């Protein structure tokens, strides 16, 4: 079995990585406590620290415990029989801690993976697994490893953890590269596409193929459809987030010109077609093999489309956030969807914008005289949209963890019936137990601009919030400047806020006031009066 398995004993393992993932203590807890008949899985996308965590734990063991520990790297074409033989030989030699990396390369893992729990773990061995095709681990958890596995999720890397690990507090750094622990996946569009096609699309398809080989009944989705068709659909599902972000950013660049007027006269889902000119996205479509919408409609059934979308959710690629027009009456709005890899969206969106800027006909239509200025402005707006998404997603996940029944976090965009005003909040946080609401605007700017708070100062809007969500307790602007307070509106630095979220989420019985600390500079900076924001449609 040596040709398909690399075996490294614990006393041969060393690592130079000192800083640890926040979830490292979960791994440590599993290894140091008894969980009879259970194994542990590090579950997440590539380049989120799974292998490093294994190395870190092994390297910190005593010399005696290292002799009882092994790291096994499974190579392609390895099967469970070979792996079991290797593990039995090592067990007979006194090894009790098994770290099995790239477990999803084992061809029949989803058939016989319960060998780890039902045989080795039952004999007192500690087993930790990880794999590039992480969806395969999830599929095994729902089948042969049901109730036999403790999952440690690594895909989600919040800002506070990201900044700690790379020692950089820059919000820009997180927007441009957030999602993994290295810049390389999102440094260029080509690198981003390669990561998307291997870490995500390939992950799903490889896992499905191996899972369906293990099925005894039911239609196999990889047999019903061509591989390229499935690849196309998955990429389109992912890329819709980039297209939506790009269109919104370009919209914000224009206050006049034919395209801006046209965009504002049609429904939001349709205007993607106006900006996705052949010149703007052909390179991206070719690289990712994306088919046109009419071709897509004649291929996968709705049931199978929903199944693929669910796999993206299982990989923690995007977040669904419930949204209400009135929380008190229960009147719903369309749920929000936020993609959890900002670096991927940023790489795609900036490439699309540059392609647009190189289209002479498009530039003439839009009246773009300065290409570089357009790209600079559009980049600014892309980062603004992504900052909104980051703050909303992290706040939602934090308060779901604290008390999912007590707190409500979402966005709000409505037209008031009494005066037909369109009003909105980039984020609303409600403490349902206390009947209190907190309203937020999010700005990718270090300037305090009076117009930024026009919705927060709208008395009709505030009355609506009081009646439908809870009495407005505080109004805030999260931005990239220094914390300050202006006319009862608190300005908080976005990076500071995101770091506080991390602290609050790990504090017993936390209070919202810990997050919205008003002990800040109350001096009066030079105020600007120009800012305009296109209303968000939910």
Model-derived regions, located:
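Hydrophobic positions on the alpha1 helix immediately C-terminal to the Walker A/P-loop
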Residues: 53
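A cross-kingdom feature that marks ATP-driven nucleic-acid transaction machinery
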Residues: 47, 323, 334-538
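Sensor-1/coupling segment of RecA-like P-loop NTPase cores
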Residues: 119-141
